[in-house]
Amino acid sequence: MILFNRVGYFVSLFATVSCGCMTQLYKNTFFRGGDLAAIYTPDAQYCQKMCTFHPRCLLFSFLAVTPPKETNKRFGCFMKESITGTLPRIHRTGAISGHSLKQCGHQISACHRDIYKGLDMRGSNFNISKTDNIEECQKLCTNNFHCQFFTYATSAFYRPEYRKKCLLKHSASGTPTSIKSADNLVSGFSLKSCALSEIGCPMDIFQHSAFADLNVSQVITPDAFVCRTICTFHPNCLFFTFYTNEWETESQRNVCFLKTSKSGRPSPPIPQENAISGYSLLTCRKTRPEPCHSKIYSGVDFEGEELNVTFVQGADVCQETCTKTIRCQFFIYSLLPQDCKEEGCKCSLRLSTDGSPTRITYGMQGSSGYSLRLCKLVDSPDCTTKINARIVGGTNASLGEWPWQVSLQVKLVSQTHLCGGSIIGRQWVLTAAHCFDGIPYPDVWRIYGGILSLSEITKETPSSRIKELIIHQEYKVSEGNYDIALIKLQTPLNYTEFQKPICLPSKADTNTIYTNCWVTGWGYTKEQGETQNILQKATIPLVPNEECQKKYRDYVINKQMICAGYKEGGTDACKGDSGGPLVCKHSGRWQLVGITSWGEGCARKDQPGVYTKVSEYMDWILEKTQSSDVRALETSSA
């Protein structure tokens, strides 16, 4: 535990307003007060991640640099809360502060790939193995049940006996117990949270069975599935036992025991009525739960500290209210006659120390449930459009089938469709940077949404104008990298059944395996063709990057790209489809997985299309959309 001495630094006049998604980091700034916990992290980004997953943390301060007398505080991550959502800022050189990402659905991810040269992340060393490089060391950690982080000593390390050795480590908190600078050492974290473990994924649920292994913690949960999710995101839980509300010992009813063992596997389950046991899903590659619980439990009362009371129409509205209230962790919606008025029934917003109810009782007239603040896509409620299923080899789409698709048209002597794009917000469209090669002038562009046929467009057809064009700063003409651009519209869109946004993926979706993917657009239906009048659609399989690279030996297919297409050809995006969406259905939602970018010809055999991988640009998208909105607010306030 790190203790921070209260020193009389200069206090800023600015308050920290915690409303909605706040991703900004404040340099040379420290939040005063509100201390919850202190840990060590290698950088501010990991500190922010830890704050996001802490049940009460709203703000954090990280010390990247400290005075010589305070070296024990360097790399200190101070997690904080505030009743008002604000804390005073003080100036401190080397400090970096920011907000939890609890309300930033697309940013929420436990995966952390960064490695840190020159740092020794210390913990309990439980395994030392010889490996040839840092990648092998990280893989070794990822495929070990107990490894949370590691340190690798290079061949230049000053102690010969440790050279090219990989030290696997863990701690009670899952974070380093201290961090020191050291030459020729490299540290990093396990990639289990990135769905890259090869351990395997036992998903068995054992009814009327209990594990008798070591308990690492316990929480109150309404069922075994919430228990399993909590186990999955706990740093030391490998399996669990949950006792139902019919368990004979009253004090253990609805108790979820989080467990571990030295071997990483549980002992054989013991037959026990009203007990349910199972495994953490941390090592799963495909089936990983989100760190949230969406089910609403009828006739159940979640007890906890009362945060606020309001009156609403329905348990789902109560859950939405809880989700939008950043400190709310769970809620009770009462249907008792004395708790109902004209405007609705009583919605009690609640919280606890660990984010779980302090007690669960049954038989009430009403419902209980959890905040959805840690659900990946909770901040895009309008993007949940359900649909019924450039395109070479495609078929005509139906009106409203792909409501996020837009046509980007240039108006010079005449008006022409040039590219596609995707609605991602009321004032934002995402497309390809190369669409603006030679035409980077916002005034000449028109954006049409909610249409099926290009021939429908007349002078009276509503269109949007560009207020701001944001092309990725690393994009270069005639290169395939960083082919992404944001369009800010002059006027916010009105959402209709024909014009709605597509869900954006989370950063954690980098390794998600998609099986139901489609491309859409008005582009050519053959290589030497012409723009189509009716929007085309085509289902298309994704191609692994390694296989795609073999087809394009003269180009580099990097992790910021994703490929799709049939081996035999015949279906692909083509000219006029650029900037349009590659969407995939995953966990019941359509997500924007790719942006049509480039390829060799159209629908050629063994020449898949190459798309910009959206999940790799989520930080950039959020940074640019938020900074633009902040600038607009500052301008309007001036």
From Swiss-Prot:
Pfam families: PAN_1, Trypsin. It is found in: Secreted. Keywords: Blood coagulation, Disulfide bond, Fibrinolysis, Glycoprotein, Hemostasis, Hydrolase, Inflammatory response, Protease, Repeat, Secreted, Serine protease, Signal, Zymogen. The keyword NAD does not apply. One of its GO terms (molecular function) is serine-type endopeptidase activity. The keyword Glycoprotein applies. It catalyses: Cleaves selectively Arg-|-Xaa and Lys-|-Xaa bonds, including Lys-|-Arg and Arg-|-Ser bonds in (human) kininogen to release bradykinin. Transmembrane segments: none annotated. CDD domains: APPLE_Factor_XI_like, Tryp_SPc. Glycans are attached at residues 127, 215, 308, 396, 494. Inhibited by SERPINA5. The active site is at 434 (charge relay system), 483 (charge relay system), 578 (charge relay system). Disulfide bonds join 21-104, 47-77, 51-57, 111-194, 137-166, 141-147, 201-284, 227-256, 231-237, 292-375, 318-347, 322-328, 340-345, 383-503, 419-435, 517-584, 548-563, 574-602. Residues 391-626 form the Peptidase S1 domain. Its EC number is 3.4.21.34. Gene3D superfamilies: Hepatocyte Growth Factor, Trypsin-like serine proteases. GO terms for biological process: blood coagulation; fibrinolysis; inflammatory response; plasminogen activation; positive regulation of fibrinolysis. Residues 1-19 form the signal peptide. GO terms for cellular component: extracellular space. Residues 21-104, 111-194, 201-284, 292-375 form the Apple domain. Forms a heterodimer with SERPINA5. The zymogen is activated by factor XIIa, which cleaves the molecule into a light chain, which contains the active site, and a heavy chain, which associates with HMW kininogen. These chains are linked by one or more disulfide bonds. Belongs to the peptidase S1 family. Plasma kallikrein subfamily. The enzyme cleaves Lys-Arg and Arg-Ser bonds. It activates, in a reciprocal reaction, factor XII after its binding to a negatively charged surface. It also releases bradykinin from HMW kininogen and may also play a role in the renin-angiotensin system by converting prorenin into renin. This is Plasma kallikrein. It comes from Mus musculus. The gene is Klkb1.
